[in-house]
Amino acid sequence: MDFKEILYNVDNGVATLTLNRPEVSNGFNIPICEEILKAIDIAKKDDTVQILLINANGKVFSVGGDLVEMQRAVDADDVQSLVRIAELVNKISFALKRLPKPVVMSTDGAVAGAAANIAVAADFCIASDKTRFIQAFVNVGLAPDAGGLFLLTRAIGITRATQLAMTGEALNAEKALEYGIVYKVCEPEKLEKITDRVITRLKRGSVNSYKAIKEMVWQSSFAGWQEYEDLELELQKSLAFTNDFKEGVRAYTEKRRPKFTGK
């Protein structure tokens, strides 16, 4: 399959999915989300694939939602496309947790919004020491999507997850390592080498064991995902109709602080 928003290739048992919209800091729109889901499905069905690696082209891993497209949707009162993106990014996190193969993510620069939560959905996140994980939703009048709070509360605890979501503070790579979100931290120039080292180690393991482990983890911790997804989409849809969301997007594109009114 030919992709336009991502790159996908398989080499020696490793499927590499590369976000390839560096001109917009790898922002998520509907096409890239659909391509990511398709690539995950291809990797799932391909018996030659042992491991899925996700990385990105450009200086930024991903800013999360494409704010330029969000501005267009706000101006056109096109709430449905915004809801569709929220639905798709949740499905991406779900697909990664349900993929019966190890998922390795290699990050550098900003990992914001939905991208930050998709990173939590990975089994191994290797981050350069320049990486920043940002729950940016509150800055534009939204709440976390991509299964964010479902994943974060389980990964780092309820209090820390709530604080990150409510403040939108950037979490640096070392702190993310301390919290357990990140597996390894290294200098940017060593990121590829360290990622390869982790993948090499994983390739020595049994694919049958990995499949069983991921199913056990799912059943023990994530079986309530569907109910959470319904709630997440319902609340995100209600927030997308608010004046605060419109103000948040406009403030971002105009490079100023938003003035929220609670309406």
Curated annotation (Swiss-Prot):
Record-linked InterPro entries: ClpP/crotonase-like_dom_sf, Enoyl-CoA_hydra/iso, Enoyl-CoA_hydra_C, Enoyl-CoA_Hydratase/Isomerase
Disrupted-gene phenotype: Mutants do not produce monounsaturated fatty acids, exhibit reduced glycolytic capability and altered glucose-PTS activity, and are extremely sensitive to low pH.
Keyword Calcium: no
SUPFAM superfamilies: ClpP/crotonase (SSF52096)
Record key words, sorted: Fatty acid metabolism, Isomerase, Lipid metabolism
Coiled coil: none
Keyword NAD listed: no
Pathway(s) served: Lipid metabolism; fatty acid biosynthesis
One Gene Ontology molecular-function label: trans-2-decenoyl-acyl-carrier-protein isomerase activity
UniProt-listed Gene3D superfamilies: 2-enoyl-CoA Hydratase, Chain A, domain 1, Lyase 2-enoyl-coa Hydratase, Chain A, domain 2
Pfam families named in the record: ECH_1 (PF00378)
Function: Catalyzes the isomerization of trans-2-decenoyl-ACP to cis-3-decenoyl-ACP. Required for survival at low pH.
Protein's recorded name: Trans-2-decenoyl-[acyl-carrier-protein] isomerase
Upper classification of the organism: Bacteria, Bacillati, Bacillota, Bacilli, Lactobacillales
